[in-house]
Amino acid sequence: MSTAAVLITGALTGIGRAAAFALAREGNRVVVSGRHEEAGQALAAELRGLAGEAEFIRADVRREDDVRNLVDQTVARFGRLDAAVNSAGTEGRPGPVTRQTADSYAATFDTNVLGILLSMKHELRVMQAQRSGSIVNVSSAYGHLGVAGASVYSASKHAVEGLTKSAALEVAYTGVRVNAVAPGPIETGMLNRFTGTAEGKAGLVAEVPLRRVGEPDEIANAIVFLCSDKASYAIGLVLSVDGGMSAG
């Protein structure tokens, strides 16, 4: 996959950031995206030391004009789009169903579901014309498991997995692959915001058969695989990387 043109949304932190570094180390040309200009430019500068070619393009995945411009600028910069990692996401408001509101639902779904829908729409526009490409969406173990206290987040990730599988079926004949990675608890700011306390994190770890949280690089490695030709026969796959949570 070396020298491929790759776009990563939600690249400024967590899994998206780890994926950007992992893909750059493979020699790929990368465009990283997020909502914060200063942090994005700093990330792109770091990546240039690895990839040689790395650019930051500011975009809010909830806004279609931003997403269209992001994809178009990526293609203008590199001439094509070989892979895309849709990592932008939010944990939403923690708490039971009875404490959720229309606003908390919309805030979570706008980023986690609409953002991926719009990203895939415009990535696929380019990839189908090329008749090649790979998209990897970042879901969650809670995209196929329930979790008390994160109902809206879980529902949004269930939707991501449905979008992934449906899009994969729609475009497979064009030579484009769509898959997802489903992490378990990963050592990120999102996890710390969700668990809130050391006790909360310990309770979550107790649900993981491996008895530890994962590292962003462990998810990034799976993303690199799904982006690459080594996963050429993987279509509509949701790859669980969750320390065994999905095995039970």
Regions found by a protein language model. Give the residues of each.
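Active-site helix of classical SDR
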Residues: 120, 156, 164
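Catalytic Tyr-X3-Lys loop
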Residues: 98-117, 132, 136, 160, ...
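Residue(s) in the substrate-gating loop at a strand-loop-helix junction
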Residues: 140
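Alpha-helical segment proximal to the catalytic Tyr-Lys
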Residues: 125, 169-173, 232
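Conserved glycine-rich cofactor-binding loop
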Residues: 12-13, 36
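Short C-terminal tail/terminal secondary-structure segment
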Residues: 91-94, 145, 224, 235-248
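Short, flexible catalytic-loop segment of classical short-chain dehydrogenase/reductase
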Residues: 161, 182-193
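Conserved mid-core segment of classical short-chain dehydrogenase/reductases
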Residues: 68, 91-106, 129, 149-152, ...
